[in-house]
């Protein structure tokens, strides 16, 4: 179920402060965050945000199409290595 409109979109306060500081300083370095639950705001467009996937920080360049989505959607947490090969087919 989607979030109520009267509440508005969620963003962690510490991430918002980092974004505002990067915009003010015109800093192009990636902003490191563990907040996968934060919503992408229009102010973030053009910034690179390093989102933690449980193992490492994945750099995500924010575009206009990403606004309204969650940061965690752009950093996959699981790797698919494929199913085991059929032993009979190898012979």
From Swiss-Prot:
What family does this belong to? Belongs to the universal ribosomal protein uS19 family.
Name under which the protein is recorded:
Small ribosomal subunit protein uS19
UniProt keyword terms in alphabetical order? Ribonucleoprotein, Ribosomal protein, RNA-binding, rRNA-binding
**GO BP annotations, alphabetical order:** ribosomal small subunit assembly; translation
Q: Which GO terms describe its cellular component?
A: cytoplasm; small ribosomal subunit
Species source reads Marinobacter nauticus (strain ATCC 700491 / DSM 11845 / VT8)
Query: Known Gene3D superfamilies for this protein?
Result: 30s Ribosomal Protein S19, Chain A (3.30.860.10)
InterPro entries assigned to the protein according to its UniProt record, in alphabetical order: Ribosomal_uS19, Ribosomal_uS19_bac-type, Ribosomal_uS19_CS, Ribosomal_uS19_SF
**Function of the molecule:** Protein S19 forms a complex with S13 that binds strongly to the 16S ribosomal RNA.
Pfam families, A to Z: Ribosomal_S19
Q: Output the Gene Ontology terms for molecular function.
A: rRNA binding; structural constituent of ribosome
